């Protein structure tokens, strides 16, 4: 199986490509592919950026509170699922609330290593090109809630599945 490749095209023309690891977190990848295929992320922003840590996006409301209207089970060790992908620079992972089964659509991309997140969040991909775009996003000026003063808009988010089909995710 060839891993799917997601392309995030920013409103300013920057582009990042991310390889998704279906063998590492299969339901998480199905969820992400499903949302991308439906155009869910088009026009959303990276609403939370923290230098030395990560950039977070995927909230349709743009304030950190939104999602797709459902959640999925967290595919990580603390939740009883083997996932050995470490939260190193460039890794893609699902954001969630305190509940380990609360991930929906919000995701984050690591701009620095964060081993304290390992086994507690569902890592499921890695940036393969365009890490410079992530670095530019994380360097933008923010308010006291880590929200960029100038919105960092994902103009278009697409996925290439190389002919592989992905079922809808299992929802909690």
Regions found by a protein language model. Name each.
Residues 1-172:
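Cyclophilin-like peptidyl-prolyl cis-trans isomerases
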């Amino acid at each position: 199986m060839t891993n799917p490749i997601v392309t995030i095209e920013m409103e300013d023309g920057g582009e990042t490509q991310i390889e998704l690891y279906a063998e590492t977190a299969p339901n998480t990848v199905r969820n992400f592919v499903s949302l991308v295929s439906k155009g869910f992320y088009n026009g959303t922003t990276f609403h939370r950026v923290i230098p030395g840590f990560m950039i977070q996006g995927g909230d349709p409301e743009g304030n950190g509170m939104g999602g797709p209207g459902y959640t999925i089970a967290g595919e990580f060790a603390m939740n009883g699922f083997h996932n050995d992908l470490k939260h190193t620079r460039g890794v893609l992972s699902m954001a969630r609330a305190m509940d380990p089964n609360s991930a929906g659509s919000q995701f984050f991309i690591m701009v620095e290593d964060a081993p304290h997140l390992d086994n507690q969040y569902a890592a499921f991909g890695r940036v393969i090109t365009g890490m410079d775009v992530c670095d530019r996003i994380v360097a933008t000026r923010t308010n006291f809630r880590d929200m960029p003063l100038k919105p960092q808009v994902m103009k278009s988010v697409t996925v290439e599945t190389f002919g592989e089909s992905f079922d809808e995710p299992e929802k909690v």
